[in-house]
């Protein structure tokens, strides 16, 4: 996020009088708080200077609903794409995903289609169903939080003590299970580590 901020605020050169893309403070706020409120400002101050935002951004506050939606959408996208890529690359098999309860239910729904359709098509549908479950959960949970926290304005969102756009507790467990599975089976897979190390050597 800091590198993205550096690109849009300093490195891009599109105007005579200043560097950056001239983005609104609301957009920059969303970029900065992509992973939630910022407590440690040292890195931001080092790159941009202490007075860059002229007190227009309160780092300890939450960000807008739009920015929170973008952040959680990233999580859903990363999980689903990595599951599909891992299966396509034969880093793990479909049956291994049955250890994750929610995925087991989704996979079971497509069991009868194995003889009729290709495994690639079935995997795509399973991934779509997984995305659908996560998106529906976010919508339902967010609606509840808006009501519980009496959110009526952007200021209410900024001042909220917790993220408004989020998974339910059960879906958070599911999200954690997927990330843990991918970490073990994909990100730390021997073939992936070899290619990662090769990439590091090229960059150096």
Annotate each language-model stretch with its function.
Residues 2, 7-16, 20-204:
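Histidine-centered, transition-metal-coordinating active-site segments
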